């Protein structure tokens, strides 16, 4: 099956698995999805991720994270830049999500970065999604 927007598909799979309190979600892998999973892990939104080698396409297994009383760590995921409407920001326009409580994931010339990292490096890019 051909997916028009693979990043939106990834976010939707994570959101659906999170809403049903699943521990694990499998997603078709790509380099960009692996980079987004790395950022989610670094920022503490997921426990871990693993690339599963299989034919014809590798899978990305994401282990979701919940608090000790069972509350979701990821309360929201939103796709910003879409194939039909790309959203780019300059270095001084990098957004803050919920006043700094969430993160914006950006695709920059230096790879996939969070909004904080992009501000520190002084670069803008394409706003892929918000996570809070």
From Swiss-Prot:
Record bears the keyword DNA-binding: no
Family matches, as SUPFAM superfamilies: Ribosomal protein S8 (SSF56047)
Q: Cellular component terms, GO, for this chain's entry?
A: ribonucleoprotein complex; ribosome
What span is annotated as the signal peptide, if there is one?
none
Keywords of the record, alphabetical order, are: Ribonucleoprotein, Ribosomal protein, RNA-binding, rRNA-binding
Q: Which family does it belong to?
A: Belongs to the universal ribosomal protein uS8 family.
Subunit architecture: Part of the 30S ribosomal subunit. Contacts proteins S5 and S12.
Classification via PANTHER family: 40S RIBOSOMAL PROTEIN S15A
- What is the official name of this protein in its record? Small ribosomal subunit protein uS8
């Amino acid at each position: 099956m051909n997916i028009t927007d693979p990043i939106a598909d990834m976010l939707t799979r994570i959101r659906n698995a999170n809403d049903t309190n699943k521990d694990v979600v499998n997603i078709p892998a790509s380099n960009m999805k692996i980079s987004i999973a790395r950022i989610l892990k670094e920022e503490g939104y997921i426990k871990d991720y693993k690339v599963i080698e299989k034919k014809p396409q590798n899978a990305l297994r994401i282990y979701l994270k919940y608090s000790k009383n069972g509350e979701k760590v990821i309360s929201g995921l939103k796709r910003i830049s879409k194939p039909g409407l790309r959203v780019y920001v300059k270095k001084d326009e990098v957004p803050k999500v919920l006043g700094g409580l969430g993160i914006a994931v950006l695709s920059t010339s230096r790879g996939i970065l969070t909004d904080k990292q992009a501000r520190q490096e002084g670069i803008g890019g394409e706003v892929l999604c918000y996570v809070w």
